[in-house]
Regions:
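Extreme N-terminal basic, low-complexity initiation segments
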Residues: 5-10
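Non-catalytic structural scaffold of enzyme domains
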Residues: 1, 16, 26-328
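Glycine-biased, low-complexity coil/linker segments
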Residues: 21-22
Length: 328
């Protein structure tokens, strides 16, 4: 199908669709597209890496920006919101669903893998890639990720694999919200002022929002900074190439890169090492709204990405400005 030849009426209907779940045209054109979910703009860095590795694929990006960030919400609310989005995305019959949100993966990734007949892959802090050379590592995460069993188990496994590395998790209660509100356009100090002042050998970004201020964090600490976007995109590419579309596919990086795991491991109960660092100031929790009220569609200029959710227009604009031009 030539998108340019068929988009005149389609785009108009899609953008202004009043129907929850999108128009019939949208569902037909993007049926079988790879689906990504994030609470807001964070997962756009993952979308960009996926587009780089899979240029012929179509994608759907669902952003629940009106309730972002998720990191300060209770796990029950997070799982409810993610489940709402996943149910809508399942209607597009995706070959895979990517949770481009560390908080969503930590809180409900495993339950979604048990529910759906397609692979569900999730973003995890890249502690296994970062810990290979040892040293003291700062792991920046949201409050919900910090308190999850999944994250504790991940740290425990990383410490067992790399005993020369020490991981210090740090809950950033306001950083994702600052990035969401400013679209990473503020001076470095705005994002780094509340971070720990200690020196570290490496920093791991445990929230996809943080990737948008990666350079600011690198300048602050003067050490390598790791995020999981590329590793997650690689896992998706391998999953699709291998035809792993059966129910129960765990989406773990261990399945594909047992020696060079760049994006986390299977989760189970456990405990990670903690340091008594001062957390960022907690911000207020966004008011809840029905996601079905924000289901009209917006499509990227090249016709490859359908944006859904309350932040569809914001995410499309930020994606086009920050990433899409680099794909041409």
């Amino acid at each position: 199908m030539n998108f340019a030849e068929n988009s005149e009426n389609f785009c108009d209907k899609a953008v202004f669709s009043p129907f929850p779940g999108g128009t019939r045209e949208g569902k037909k054109f993007f049926s079988g597209a790879v689906c990504l979910f994030d609470s807001g703009v964070g997962g756009l860095s993952v979308l960009f890496k996926c587009r780089e590795m899979l240029p012929s694929r179509k994608f759907i990006y669902y952003g629940d920006n009106v309730r972002a960030p998720y990191g300060n919400l209770p796990p029950e609310a997070i799982c409810r919101y993610v489940s709402e989005a996943a149910e809508e995305l399942a209607g597009y019959f995706p070959p895979a669903l990517v949770l481009a949100c560390n908080t969503a993966e930590a809180c409900c990734g495993e339950s979604l893998r048990k529910k759906y007949p397609f692979p569900v892959l999730g973003a995890c802090p890249s502690v296994l890639a970062a810990g290979k050379n040892g040293g003291d590592g700062l792991v920046l995460v949201t409050r919900a990720t910090y308190e999850s069993r999944a994250f504790a188990s991940l740290l425990r496994q990383a410490e067992m694999r790399f005993p020369a590395a020490r991981f210090y998790p740090y809950p950033c209660d306001s950083l994702a919200g600052k990035i969401e509100d400013t679209l990473a356009s503020a001076p470095d100090e705005f994002y780094t002022a509340e971070l720990p002042t200690q020196k570290f050998s490496f920093v791991v970004l445990g929230c996809t929002h943080y990737a948008h201020v990666r350079e600011a964090i690198a300048r602050r600490y003067g050490c390598p900074v790791y995020d999981g976007a590329e590793g997650l995109a690689r896992r998706l590419a391998v999953t699709l190439a291998a035809g792993k579309t059966e129910a129960g596919s765990r989406g773990s990086a261990e399945d594909f890169f047992p020696e060079e795991n760049e994006n986390g491991v299977d989760f189970s109960a456990g405990k990670g090492k903690e340091q008594n660092l001062r957390p960022c100031v907690t911000t207020s929790v966004p008011a809840t709204q029905n996601s079905a009220d924000f289901s009209a569609e917006t499509i990227s200029s090249d016709g490859k990405v359908l944006f859904l959710g309350s932040g569809r227009e914001k995410n499309r604009t930020f994606y086009e400005h920050s990433f899409a031009r680099n794909l041409s």
